[in-house]
Regions:
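Short glycine/proline- and aromatic-enriched beta-strand/turn motifs that initiate or cap beta-hairpins
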Residues: 20-69, 236-249
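Predominantly the C-terminal beta-signal and adjacent terminal strand-loop region
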Residues: 23-31, 204-249
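Residues that define the transmembrane beta-barrel architecture of outer-membrane proteins
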Residues: 31-33, 55-61, 149-156, 170, ...
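Extracellular/periplasm-exposed beta-strand and loop segments of Gram-negative cell-envelope proteins
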Residues: 48-56, 88-152, 183-194, 230-234
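Outer-membrane beta-barrel pore domains and translocons
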Residues: 38-44, 82-86, 177-181, 220-222, ...
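Short loop/turn motifs that connect adjacent beta-strands in outer-membrane beta-barrel proteins
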Residues: 21-32, 69-79, 165-172, 209-214, ...
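Residues on the lipid-exposed face of transmembrane beta-strands in outer-membrane beta-barrel proteins
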Residues: 37-39, 61-67, 156-162, 176-180, ...
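Transmembrane beta-strands of outer-membrane beta-barrel proteins
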Residues: 31-37, 75-83, 172-178, 197-199, ...
């Protein structure tokens, strides 16, 4: 345990500049133009805002640009835009397996996976007499749930961010972003669309290692849906954890 504590303390010293006193208290952290790279992840989805598709996973890697618009003693207001070249979205799939035991010989039929809003595993037996042949038909039907991943890209050109306490290294921050994503398959269901609108709102904390470099950790509520540009519009609500590294000039 002692060695682990030493390693953690060493990493902390590497991340936090030792010469904190070199930055005057009156200085404002950050620059007019800021660039960043981020990664985020959500392990599940549920009905939070408008979405009804459950069990979706979502992760992305992207790039961020921010331009400072207003600076006061208490806050900084910025324009924000993000480009996401790599998005992976995972949907639940439904698979039906029918094992017919009568009449012999036994036969098995497996359906193709179908992406649906929710999936619950189930199994049931059936038995009936075919009125045309008088033969007993019996067997079992099993519903199993799977998962498929879909590649997508996204762009959020409409966004804003507010940082509070701009003269402090630790700054509370909040953001709103709006844009769209394009996917290689229809999401989140097979009757959905490959084009979806996306909205994010969240808050977190930003730590400035130097006046021009920072690390930001946020929790975001995200919604995407096709606004009925496709036959169905289930939508997905997710809670994402997002880490961003930024540098300014």
């Amino acid at each position: 345990m002692k060695s682990v504590a030493v390693v953690v303390f060493a990493v902390f010293l590497a991340l936090v500049p030792p010469a904190l006193a070199q930055v005057p208290d009156s200085a404002t952290f950050g620059r007019k133009n800021t660039f960043g790279i981020f990664v985020d992840y959500s392990n599940d989805s549920s009905h939070i805002i408008l979405g009804s598709a459950e069990g979706r996973k979502f992760t992305e890697i992207g790039f961020q640009y921010e331009r400072r618009l207003i600076v006061t003693h208490n806050l900084v207001w910025k324009y924000t835009a993000e480009f996401r070249p790599l998005i992976a979205e995972s949907d639940l799939t439904y698979i039906e397996t029918t094992v017919q035991t009568s009449p012999p010989p036994a036969q098995t039929f497996v359906s193709q996976p179908v992406a649906i809003p929710q999936c619950r595993p189930a199994s049931a037996s059936y038995s009936f007499i075919n009125p045309d042949t008088g033969i007993v038909q019996a067997g079992t039907i099993t519903i199993s749930c799977g998962r498929r991943w879909t590649y997508a890209e996204g762009l959020s050109p409409l966004g804003t961010r507010i940082n509070f306490l701009p003269r402090k290294r630790w700054q509370p921050t909040g953001s709103i972003l709006a844009g769209f994503l394009l996917s290689s398959k229809k999401i989140p269901v097979d009757t959905g669309g490959s084009f979806n609108f996306m909205f994010q709102v969240g808050a977190g904390v930003e730590y400035f290692r130097t006046p021009t470099q920072s690390m930001r950790l946020e929790y975001l509520l995200q919604h995407f849906s096709n606004a009925y540009t496709a036959p169905t519009n289930y939508g997905v609500d997710s809670g994402l954890f997002k880490f961003t590294y930024t540098f300014g000039r």
